[in-house]
């Protein structure tokens, strides 16, 4: 059963229900409340000597005249002298006509053939009255109006038959003859009405019921045509709502009958705060019951109005031009209404895409995000990491985000990024968990990989964010930005590891003049070079094998898109592919990479001590102490080398195994294996 959305609607006046003379119920109720209440005696003339006579007391020709007179009344729902209405309480709309059992059997049989038509009329008439109340919705109002027009024709036919009867030209066989053509149509309408009343159908439910009944009557052209006419009349009000939606983007639905629901609690501002991007998918949504003739195009109708609404909220009040609008009708040649809806959808799609691309420069905004969050232009980041080193080395709970923001602004203003007017939309943030922990909220990861929160520094949790205004937030939503941030955090930490190893390499280069052949310094230098080659290979893979190619694919696709949904689809596909290509959706590979980076950082931090110890060893004159200390330094370097090579070699099989399902890992595997063979 379809229920209407609880929307305030006008109340039917009490006097319209309490006064039967306004509805015609007095014809049916006055006699039922008097002498026909319990047991009824049939009389011919109430002014006779008080003796009530049954119809069987009269001759057959007289009985026929009396029966015809009563049948003409029964055809419009009024009891006669010898024909009464029996109502069965407990069964909704259950009524039956009865005759005086003393009536001639032939006349009884003919009368009973006409009784169904009388019952159908009563049922339809009651439905017309009840459905005309405000609460039943526009579709029921329109359906009731069409039925009322049909009943007027029916009543005109009864009036003509009565005229013939008064002229003495109508027999009971003639009455049956004239009633037969209406029997099938009234039966079909009564069946529809009974089902609609029982299940309390409104809106789409009524239209679907009418259409299904029309299809079921395919063998009876006249009945099918009538039901199709009723469907067309009932759908006019519904199509008026549809027209405003696809042509103006407005839901003018006072009784909640339309198949598109609006969630007013969701605001456009939520796109920059809600990580699930509910606004675009749930602000307007499809209800369960959709008219059958619109089922295949319901999604198109939904997006058409959504596009027009987005433009309206941008202050760009665009409507489908009057010259391009056509009256939507269900029945017609070649389903003209489908062509109208598709034309309106194409217009709204192109207008919104052009608005976002041209006025709001979507591609330029995406390119700006690529510069900063995907490190396409990293000069500002180098400067920032230099001036923010002290703050980033603090524990997470000790970091001042305000200070980091000031340092970020300084780095942006003093580098090439200052020429970009969008750099002011860049902000910094510090997460409370490591990258593995953050990803663990979405993916199953080993609990051993989750680090102690107290040991995490800003270097593992620092990230950038980007202010995105409406309507670009439809495409670059909070959910999309969170994906950018995951990629940025991984790249940022890789850059940090590379900088630390470069510092260690510079220390080694500073002592090249020393004779280090066969010493721990030489071994340390080779290890540093291998580590630097590893992290450089990883960054090269991330940048040139993953981010750049996927960016160009997305950029090319955006040039030919014709709807915002396609734009969102291409952008989300780009981000998901980058996340997977950057190993962030592959826990086994990512944990190996994090372990290797951790070893590199530990080695880089120990380099100063290792080098200074090696220099001191060469300058000392006590052989025994020199040997012990040299052994300690050499053993430390061996431990770093052994751990690094072990992790690197174990990464190879993981990448080879993963490359069967993820072919792009083959490129990374080639780089990594190249490092391990050196």
Swiss-Prot record:
Coiled coil: none annotated. Keywords: Cytoplasm, Cytoskeleton, Developmental protein, Microtubule, Nucleus. Residues 63-116, 118-180, 290-318, 472-548, 587-622 are annotated as: Triggers nucleus envelope localization. Disruption phenotype: Embryonic lethality. Impaired development of male and female gametophytes. Signal peptide: none annotated. Pfam families: GCP_C_terminal, GCP_N_terminal. Changing residue 305 to R: In spr3; right-handed helical growth due to anisotropic cell expansion and abnormal microtubule branching characterized by wider and divergently distributed nucleating angles. Impaired interaction with GCP3. One of its GO terms (molecular function) is gamma-tubulin binding. GO terms for cellular component: cell cortex; cortical microtubule; cytoplasm; gamma-tubulin complex; nuclear envelope; spindle pole. Transmembrane segments: none annotated. GO terms for biological process: gametophyte development; gamma-tubulin complex localization; microtubule nucleation; positive regulation of microtubule nucleation. It is found in: Cytoplasm, Cytoskeleton, Microtubule organizing center; Nucleus envelope; Cytoplasm; Cytoplasm, Cell cortex. Part of the gamma-tubulin complex. Gamma-tubulin complex is composed of gamma-tubulin and GCP proteins (e.g. GCP2 and GCP3). Interacts directly with GCP3. PANTHER family: GAMMA TUBULIN COMPLEX PROTEIN, GAMMA-TUBULIN COMPLEX COMPONENT 2. Gamma-tubulin complex is necessary for microtubule nucleation at the microtubule organizing centers (MTOCs). Required for the positioning of the gamma-tubulin-containing complex on pre-existing microtubules and for the proper organization of cortical arrays. Belongs to the TUBGCP family. This is Gamma-tubulin complex component 2. It comes from Arabidopsis thaliana. The gene is GCP2.
């Amino acid at each position: 059963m379809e229920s209407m959305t609880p929307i305030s609607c006008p109340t039917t006046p009490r006097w319209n229900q309490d006064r039967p003379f306004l509805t015609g119920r007095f014809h049916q109720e006055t006699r039922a409340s008097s002498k026909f209440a319990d047991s009824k005696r049939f009389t011919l003339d109430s002014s006779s000597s008080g003796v009530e006579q049954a119809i069987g007391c009269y001759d057959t020709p007289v009985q026929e005249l009396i029966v015809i007179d009563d049948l003409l009344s029964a055809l419009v729902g009024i009891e006669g002298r010898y024909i009464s209405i029996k109502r069965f309480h407990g069964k909704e709309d259950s009524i039956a006509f009865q005759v005086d059992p003393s009536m001639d059997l032939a006349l009884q049989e003919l009368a009973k053939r006409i009784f169904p038509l009388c019952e159908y009329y009563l049922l339809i008439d009651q439905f017309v009255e009840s459905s005309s109340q405000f609460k039943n919705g526009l579709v029921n109002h329109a359906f009731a109006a069409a039925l009322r027009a049909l009943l007027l024709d029916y009543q005109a036919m009864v009036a003509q038959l009565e005229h013939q009867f008064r002229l003495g030209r109508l027999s009971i066989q003639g009455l049956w003859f004239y009633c037969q053509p209406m029997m099938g149509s009234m039966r079909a309408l009564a069946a529809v009405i009974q089902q609609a009343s029982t299940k309390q159908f409104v809106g789409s439910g009524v239209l679907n019921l009418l259409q299904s009944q029309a299809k079921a009557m395919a063998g009876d052209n006249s009945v099918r045509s009538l039901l199709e006419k009723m469907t067309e009349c009932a759908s006019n009000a519904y199509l008026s709502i549809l027209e405003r939606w696809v042509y103006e983007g407005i839901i003018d639905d006072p009784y909640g009958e339309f198949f598109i629901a609006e969630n007013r609690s969701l605001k456009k501002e939520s796109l920059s705060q809600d990580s699930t991007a509910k606004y675009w998918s749930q602000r307007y949504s499809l209800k369960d019951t959709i008219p059958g003739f619109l089922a295949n195009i319901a999604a198109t109708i939904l997006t058409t109005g959504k596009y027009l609404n987005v433009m309206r909220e941008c202050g760009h009040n665009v409507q489908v031009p009057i010259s391009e609008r056509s009256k939507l009708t269900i029945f017609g040649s070649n389903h003209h209404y489908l062509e109208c809806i598709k034309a309106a959808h194409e217009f709204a799609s192109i207008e919104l895409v052009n608005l976002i691309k041209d006025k709001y420069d979507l591609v330029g905004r995406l390119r700006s995000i690529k510069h900063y969050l995907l490190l396409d232009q990293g000069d500002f980041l180098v400067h920032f990491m230099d001036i923010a080193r002290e703050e980033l080395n603090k524990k997470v709970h000790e970091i001042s985000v305000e200070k980091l923001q000031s340092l970020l602004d300084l780095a942006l203003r003093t580098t090439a990024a200052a020429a970009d007017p969008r750099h002011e939309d860049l902000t910094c943030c510090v997460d409370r968990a490591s990258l593995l922990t953050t990803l663990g909220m979405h993916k199953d990861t080993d609990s051993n990989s989750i680090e102690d929160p107290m040991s995490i520094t800003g270097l593992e949790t620092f990230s950038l964010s980007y202010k995105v205004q409406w309507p670009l937030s439809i495409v670059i939503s909070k959910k999309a930005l969170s994906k950018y941030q995951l990629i940025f955090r991984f790249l940022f930490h890789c850059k940090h590891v590379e900088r630390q190893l470069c510092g260690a390499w510079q220390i080694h280069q500073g002592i090249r003049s020393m004779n280090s052949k066969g010493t721990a310094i030489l071994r340390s230098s080779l290890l540093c070079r291998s580590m630097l080659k590893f992290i450089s290979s990883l960054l090269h893979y991330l940048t040139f094998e993953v981010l750049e190619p996927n960016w160009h694919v997305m950029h090319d696709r955006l040039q030919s898109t014709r709807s915002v949904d396609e734009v969102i689809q291409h952008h989300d596909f780009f981000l998901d592919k980058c996340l997977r290509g950057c190993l962030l959706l592959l826990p086994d590979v990512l944990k190996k990479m994090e372990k290797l980076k951790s070893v590199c950082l530990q080695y880089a931090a120990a380099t100063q001590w290792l080098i200074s110890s090696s220099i001191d060893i060469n300058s000392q004159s006590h052989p025994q102490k020199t040997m012990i200390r040299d052994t300690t330094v050499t053993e430390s370097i061996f431990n770093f080398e052994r751990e690094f090579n072990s992790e690197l070699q174990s990464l190879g099989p993981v990448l080879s195994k993963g490359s069967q399902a993820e072919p792009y890992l083959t490129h990374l595997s080639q780089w990594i294996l190249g490092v391990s063979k050196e």
